[in-house]
C-alpha cells in the first residue's frame, strides 16, 4: 500500500493528471486503429502460414511452427491488451473506480510481461533451431522436429508466464501507469521492484543478444557454403535463405522495438537517487519516456507478421532473380557433412 492515506489497492500511485490531459494523450481512435491494423496483419500472416505448412520439409515445418507460435502470440497480445486500453480510452473511466481491488491491473500486468517477453524468447529459440539446422543438420531426428518445436513454444510460454506471475508472489509490483490507461511493472527502488525490473530487462536483452550471436554464425556458415569451392554444385536451398532472411528481419525488429524499453527499465530502477519518490510518484518526464518506449515496443506485434509476409521466396525472387534460376533441389547439408568428416 502506498502511503497516500487512501483505502485503494496497492496498484495505485499518485499521477496528478487531469481529465483534459488524458483526453489529449489517450486517443481512442489511434488505439483502435493500431489494434485493428495489428490484428489484421497477424491474421493475414496466420492464413499465409497455414498454406505454407502444407507439403513442406520437416526442417521447414519446424521453423514454420515457431513462426506460427510467434504470430499467434502477437495476435493474442494485441487482442487482450488492446481491448483493455481501447475501452479505457473510449470511456475515460477512472481505474480506481472500476478496479479498486487491482485485479484487472494485476491481470494486465501479467499479460504485458507475458506477451512482451514471449516474442523475444521465441526469437532466441528460432535462432537456436536454425543454428542447429545449418551447422548440425543431422544432430536431431527430423520426424520429431515439429513436435519438439511445439514443445519448445509451450516451454517459452510457460517461462514467460512464470515471470509474469512473480509480482503476484511478492517479487515486484504492478501499478497503473501514466496516463492511467495501462498497468506495468513498477520502476521503484524497493528490492522487489528492482529485482523484477532487472530480471525482465536482462532476460529480454539476453534473448536478443543470443539471437544476434547465433544468427551471425548461421549467416556466416551460409555465406561460406555459398562462396566455397563447391558453391557451383552445392549451394543453400531457397528455403534456407528464406528462413534466415525472415529470422534476421524478426531479430532486427525486436532489437529496434524492445531494446530501448529494456535499457530504460534497467537504468531507471538502478538510478541513484531513486527515480520514484517514497510516495510512489515518478517525474512527468520519466512517465512520458516510459509511455513512449512502451508504444515503440508494441510496434513489434505489428511488424513481426509483415517480416514473414514480405520475406517469402515469392517476394525475394523479385528482388534477387538468381533465387529462381539456380537449382532448388541442392542443399548445403552434403557440404557440411563432408567438412565435419574431414575434421
From Swiss-Prot:
Its main location: membrane. Keywords: Cell membrane, Disease variant, Disulfide bond, G-protein coupled receptor, Glycoprotein, Membrane, Phosphoprotein, Receptor, Transducer, Transmembrane, Transmembrane helix. Residues 1-29, 88-106, 173-193, 271-289 are extracellular. The chain crosses the membrane at residues 30-52, 67-87, 107-128, 150-172, 194-219, 247-270, 290-311. GO terms for biological process: adenylate cyclase-activating G protein-coupled receptor signaling pathway; cellular response to lipopolysaccharide; G protein-coupled receptor signaling pathway; inflammatory response; negative regulation of cell migration involved in sprouting angiogenesis; positive regulation of angiogenesis; positive regulation of blood coagulation; positive regulation of blood pressure. Residues 53-66, 129-149, 220-246, 312-343 are cytoplasmic. PANTHER family: G-PROTEIN COUPLED RECEPTOR FAMILY 1 MEMBER, THROMBOXANE A2 RECEPTOR. This is Thromboxane A2 receptor. It comes from Homo sapiens. The gene is TBXA2R.
Amino acid at each position: 500500500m502506498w502511503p497516500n492515506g487512501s483505502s485503494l489497492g496497492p496498484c495505485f500511485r499518485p499521477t496528478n493528471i487531469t481529465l483534459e490531459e488524458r483526453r489529449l494523450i489517450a486517443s481512442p481512435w489511434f488505439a483502435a486503429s493500431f489494434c485493428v491494423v495489428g490484428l489484421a496483419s497477424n491474421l493475414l500472416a496466420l492464413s499465409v502460414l497455414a498454406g505454407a505448412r502444407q507439403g513442406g520439409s520437416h526442417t521447414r515445418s519446424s521453423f514454420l511452427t515457431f513462426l506460427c507460435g510467434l504470430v499467434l502470440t502477437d495476435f493474442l497480445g494485441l487482442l487482450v491488451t488492446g481491448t483493455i486500453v481501447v475501452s479505457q480510452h473510449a470511456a475515460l473511466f477512472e481505474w480506481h473506480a472500476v478496479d479498486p481491488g487491482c485485479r484487472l491491473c494485476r491481470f494486465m500486468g501479467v499479460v504485458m510481461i507475458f506477451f512482451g517477453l514471449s516474442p523475444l524468447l521465441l526469437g532466441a529459440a528460432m535462432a537456436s533451431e536454425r543454428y542447429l539446422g545449418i551447422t548440425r543438420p543431422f544432430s536431431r531426428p527430423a520426424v520429431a522436429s515439429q513436435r519438439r518445436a511445439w514443445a519448445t513454444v509451450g516451454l517459452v510460454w510457460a517461462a514467460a508466464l512464470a515471470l509474469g506471475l512473480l509480482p503476484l508472489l511478492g517479487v515486484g509490483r504492478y501499478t497503473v501507469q501514466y496516463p492511467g490507461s495501462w498497468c506495468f511493472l513498477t520502476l521503484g527502488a524497493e528490492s522487489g521492484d528492482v529485482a523484477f525490473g532487472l530480471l525482465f530487462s536482462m532476460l529480454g536483452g539476453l534473448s536478443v543478444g543470443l539471437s544476434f550471436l547465433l544468427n551471425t554464425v548461421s549467416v556466416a556458415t551460409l555465406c561460406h557454403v555459398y562462396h566455397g569451392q563447391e558453391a557451383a554444385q552445392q549451394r543453400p536451398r531457397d528455403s534456407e535463405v528464406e528462413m534466415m532472411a525472415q529470422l534476421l528481419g524478426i531479430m532486427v525488429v525486436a532489437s529496434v522495438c524492445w531494446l530501448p524499453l529494456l535499457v530504460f527499465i534497467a537504468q531507471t530502477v538502478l538510478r541513484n537517487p531513486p527515480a520514484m519518490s517514497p510516495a510512489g510518484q515518478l517525474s512527468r518526464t520519466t512517465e512520458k519516456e516510459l509511455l513512449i518506449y512502451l508504444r515503440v515496443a508494441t510496434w513489434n506485434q505489428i511488424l513481426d507478421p509483415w517480416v514473414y509476409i514480405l520475406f517469402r521466396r515469392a517476394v525475394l525472387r523479385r528482388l534477387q532473380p538468381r533465387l529462381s534460376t539456380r537449382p532448388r533441389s541442392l542443399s548445403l547439408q552434403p557440404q557440411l557433412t563432408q567438412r565435419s568428416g574431414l575434421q
